[in-house]
From Swiss-Prot:
Homodimer which binds Holliday junction (HJ) DNA. The HJ becomes 2-fold symmetrical on binding to RuvC with unstacked arms; it has a different conformation from HJ DNA in complex with RuvA. In the full resolvosome a probable DNA-RuvA(4)-RuvB(12)-RuvC(2) complex forms which resolves the HJ. It comes from Paraburkholderia phytofirmans (strain DSM 17436 / LMG 22146 / PsJN) (Burkholderia phytofirmans). This is Crossover junction endodeoxyribonuclease RuvC. Mg(2+) 2 binds at residue 66. Signal peptide: none annotated. The RuvA-RuvB-RuvC complex processes Holliday junction (HJ) DNA during genetic recombination and DNA repair. Endonuclease that resolves HJ intermediates. Cleaves cruciform DNA by making single-stranded nicks across the HJ at symmetrical positions within the homologous arms, yielding a 5'-phosphate and a 3'-hydroxyl group; requires a central core of homology in the junction. The consensus cleavage sequence is 5'-(A/T)TT(C/G)-3'. Cleavage occurs on the 3'-side of the TT dinucleotide at the point of strand exchange. GO terms for biological process: DNA recombination; DNA repair. GO terms for cellular component: cytoplasm; Holliday junction resolvase complex. It is found in: Cytoplasm. Keywords: Cytoplasm, DNA damage, DNA recombination, DNA repair, DNA-binding, Endonuclease, Hydrolase, Magnesium, Metal-binding, Nuclease. Its cofactor is Mg(2+).
Amino acid sequence: MRILGIDPGLRVTGFGVIDQSGHTLSYVASGVIKTADADLPSRLGTIFEGISTLIRQHSPDQSAIEKVFVNVNPQSTLLLGQARGAAICGLVASGVPVAEYTALQLKQAVVGYGRATKEQMQQMVVRLLNLSGVPGTDAADALGMAICHAHGGTTLSTLGGIAPSLAKKGLRVRRGRLVG
């Protein structure tokens, strides 16, 4: 199964594509969709078109996107919601099923700790997908979203305390940290 993960943002929308075969996860692609300093409708159009292009290029079977959280700044929350809506429209228009997860679910599923830092997320994504380099935070969050969906949104502790791909390497997660 091929999964497209999306970390929505008005200026930068992260994306990550992985393949899942049983407990094995494989990296396919990741990156960002950047919007120019333009009016809001143009930015939303760029996000929609970017997602549509990714779907044509990678043919995902399913997708996962982060739910909007209420920020201190209501204007930022509204703008994020609109960017998220543009991404979801691109997915739905292409017939790709959409799953939604909170940031807490994402961090628990990938790191095993709901208050994990961006750096911890990046490191776990590198280890889970056996990457040679560290992706940027937006791409790492999007890859994490795809991993979260592959795990069914469950935490590492629900999966027996150890992600199967980490167990093969003799690693486990304790208090949000990777230990050997």
